[in-house]
Design a protein with these regions (language model features):
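N-terminal (or domain-start) structured segment
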Residues: 23-124, 185-198, 203-208, 301-303
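Hinge/capping helix and adjacent helix->loop/strand transition within the periplasmic-binding protein
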Residues: 94-100, 114-193, 197, 248, ...
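C-terminal lobe and pocket-closing loops
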Residues: 216-286, 315-318
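Short, low-complexity disordered leader/linker segments with a strong preference
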Residues: 1-42, 326
């Protein structure tokens, strides 16, 4: 599958959460035999969300592909959930200069600062690589009366529809907000800290609909426990398991949005360490482990490394500011 660059537009509401960061500690790096940077000991991949969701899957898969690209590295994953990602990102902010630390990043990197209630933005960190784009599906229980996304939208104009979201600044909330703006419907949000919790709530009948990435819900789709009403993507998926799911646009809802998946290093690291991690991730996306991650999670392999990733973030941040800057 060919990898390309892409840019997406996001929107998010205000998050009333402010977390102060502490000062960073030991860099964790060392000088190699050739005078360049090398990590010292194990590397930690921070996931700013709970276990079981798309961000957790991304962080663990990224660790695996890094290890495949460099057999001298061992990557452990550490979940720091809370505040729709704010807890993990704020912890990461406090680790400025730590060259043995990475973070599995996504849309919250841009969405949280737009809220104006956190003490960081993307410029406080070191962008390493954008790995992929991840579209989302509107999901209902198998016994739901709704057959299409258009059915849900029409119902939401006159009755209460509870919509489960994973974090109040993430992809799920964005697509529901864009759908509201496009159609005039209103959804009653119920936030959860991870895709795993969101799936459990949907299966338990606590919510009417959910927005979930294919990789988070494919097992339940294949078992028939849930149904996908539409995909918030520009075109239908090429993947056989998802090819029959119509886009929202096909149902008269002109909304598409892709959450990016990527890797950050802390701010304040050396240029040698930055280049080391860029080189490592460029090697990582050439591994079979990367291809497996893309295919198993039904992602679009659109990559951007180093300065290209910075440009991607700059462009999307400008678009976000235009939408919700006032």
């Amino acid at each position: 599958m060919k990898r390309t660059r892409s840019a997406v537009l996001a929107w998010t509401p205000v998050l009333a959460l402010s977390l102060a960061a502490c000062s960073g500690g030991d860099s964790g790096g060392s000088t190699g035999a050739d005078g360049g940077f090398e990590p010292r000991g194990d590397v930690t991949m921070v996931v700013p969300f709970g276990a079981g969701g798309g961000s957790d899957l991304a962080g663990r898969a990224t660790g695996t592909m890094i290890e495949a690209a460099n057999e001298d590295l061992t990557v452990s994953v550490e979940n720091r959930e809370g505040g729709s990602g704010a807890v993990g990102y704020s912890y990461f902010l406090g680790e400025s200069g730590n060259e043995n630390l990475l973070l599995a990043t996504e849309t919250a990197l841009l969405a949280l600062p737009i809220s104006g209630e956190v003490e960081f933005d993307y410029t406080d960190f070191t962008p390493i690589m954008k790995l992929a784009d991840d579209f989302t599906l509107m999901i209902v229980n198998a016994d739901s009366p709704y057959q299409t996304c258009a059915d849900v939208v029409e119902a939401a104009k006159s009755e209460r529809i509870t919509a489960g979201i994973s974090g109040i600044t993430g992809l799920d909330n964005i697509v529901f907000t864009l759908t509201e703006q496009e159609t005039g419907a209103e959804f009653d949000r119920v936030p959860f800290e991870s895709g795993g919790e969101l799936t459990a709530a949907l299966l338990g009948g606590q919510i009417d609909i959910a927005s979930l990435n294919p990789g988070e819900i494919i097992g339940q789709l294949e078992s028939g426990d849930v149904r996908a009403l539409c995909a918030f993507s520009e075109e239908r998926y090429d993947y056989e398991a998802l090819a029959d799911i119509p886009t929202a646009a096909e149902q008269g809802i002109d909304v598409s949005f892709a959450q990016f998946r990527g890797v950050l290093a802390p701010g304040g690291i050396s240029e040698e360490a930055r280049q080391y991690w860029i080189d490592t991730m460029e090697a990582a996306v050439e591994t079979e482990e990367y291809q497996t991650y893309i295919e198993d999670n039904y992602l679009q392999p659109n990559t951007a490394s180093g300065d290209e990733f910075v440009e991607y973030l700059e462009g999307n941040n400008e678009l976000l500011q235009q939408v919700i800057g006032e």
